[in-house]
Amino acid sequence: MAKSPTPIPAPPVKIQRDTNGVAPAAPATKPKKAAPKKRRKRRRNPLLWFLHGLIRRIYFGLKTASRLVLLVPILVFMVAFSYNVDRSGLFQGALAPRRIVNLMLQGYDVTNFEQMDERQVVQLFAQDVEQAPEAIGIGSSRVLQFNRENTGVDTFFNMGVTGADVRDNMTSYYKMVSYGKTPKVLLWSIDPWVFYGSEDAFDSRADADLYNEFLTKVLNVPTDYEEPDKVELWKALADPAYFQGNVDYYIKNRGQTTVTDDDGNTIEFNPVQGDPYDQTTTIKRSDGSVLYDVAFRTQTADQIRTLAAEACMSFNSVHMEGFDEMSTTQIQAFESFMDYAREQGTTVILVLSPWHPYLYGYLITEPELHKGFFQVENWLREYCAKNNVPLYGSYDPECIDGLEETDFFDGLHCAGTGIARFFPGIPQALQQLETGTLPDPLAVHPRTSLESADPDVVETLNGETAETAQEG
């Protein structure tokens, strides 16, 4: 076995010594840092925490509000502009009636009466007139000849409408009261169908919802009336699209003599040009009364009598078809309304506008067909005597001294000359009421049949009596 080679010796380890001959100590290991102690959270004061949050919210709220404040004038302008222009009539009423009322309030007479929505005009007048008139008139077309001249009141306004029924009468006055413009005097030309309880007594143009509102809120009569929800309606005021539409409409019609509606159609209601008494069409006066065209106002007695004769066959169709008896319900409504007006501080003056002599003479020949009609006047006379209510006129033309056929336009409508024969004017009526010198309502006895008239004297179409016609 061969011997291994001689191993190489390891080199000697050099030991460094310090100057004193001592070997240095082994290097010490670096001590570990002690783990930091976990700090204990300081508990917040709840009050301070709340105040801090509150201040923070207020700060950011004010910061946001300061930016929004810059938008407020713009929003206010949009709302005000849309409300006043209101091209769709959401708040101010339809454009055509608004134009009529605006012209009347400026003192203008207005053309094209036959095309007017009279009921809208009346309601918008109540809304827009700044101060309450001293006196207003209500009733059907039979009241429309009362004006500022024959009533003697400079601020009188006639709120009568064609075909007015009991609902039109009462709601016209109610609108004035609800707008805070209660008149001192209410002149009511009361028609017999006010006391008829049938649907035939109602006009389809009357505002039934407004009447139900009046019955429910004022007279406490149960109806199906419900307060309308106007939230969605008022949202339109802040609608940018509605604002833009109103701007377009305003720019289009500003300064124009011809005004259009929302659809671009011309609104044919304009100030009367020239003498109002020389117009070829019927016009609406600035006081609400009506001035018929010159041809209708200047008819001869024969022409007027012919129209009265034509009304004989259709008399009951004027809200009195089947009117055999006064309605207890309508009597109660009338009495409640009169009490309501007194509570508002309004003096009510009742007027019975006469019918043409030929027409009334015909009616008393068939009293069985007009029982309800003939009951009304005597009942009203008893009511006025009992309650000290001023009453002027009579349905029976023979009860009015000096009344002539030419004091009428036709069978139903008495002219201003006829009114002057029985109505002294509002100032004198109020004076008579104050001094206790009112005409005695029970001193007048209207004819209700031939038994209360001369049975041998009945007027015919040509103006003769039946007695003289037989002799001829």
Identify the meaning behind each predicted range.
Residues 1-42:
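N-terminal targeting leaders characterized by basic, low-complexity, disordered sequences
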Residues 63-84:
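Hydrophobic membrane-insertion alpha-helices, especially the h-region
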Residues 84-103:
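Alpha-helical transmembrane signal-anchor/signal-peptide segments
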Residues 131-224:
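Membrane-embedded segments
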Residues 204-344, 439-472:
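Secreted/periplasmic serine-hydrolase-like ester/acetyl group-modifying domain
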Residues 338-366:
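Active-site segments of SGNH/GDSL-like serine hydrolases
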Residues 358-393:
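Substrate-gating cap/lid alpha-helix
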Residues 407-455:
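Histidine-centered active-site loop/cap adjacent to the catalytic His
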